[in-house]
């Protein structure tokens, strides 16, 4: 399973998720949407540019999680 977090460094909800990732030592690819490439990939893949967004890739399937609470809950059950 591959995890990628689309985030903005100024977003308080993103900071909450980032702190959880750091605390739990989860291996997540961080993608700052300040980069045009990451912002475009988020819109193309997930359909919107809302952050935070966790992309979960497993067995050829993609799942896009957008709410910080949902993302944190998902990470806690890994």
Predicted regions and their residues:
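GST-like domain detector, emphasizing the conserved glutathione-binding G-site
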Residues: 1-9, 15-78
């Amino acid at each position: 399973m591959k995890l990628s977090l689309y985030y903005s460094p100024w977003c308080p909800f993103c900071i909450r998720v980032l702190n959880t990732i750091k605390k739990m030592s989860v291996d997540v690819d961080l993608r700052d949407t300040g980069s045009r490439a990451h912002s475009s990939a988020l819109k193309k893949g997930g359909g919107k540019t809302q952050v935070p967004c966790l992309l979960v890739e497993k067995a050829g399937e993609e799942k896009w999680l957008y709410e910080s609470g949902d993302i944190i809950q998902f990470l806690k059950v890994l």
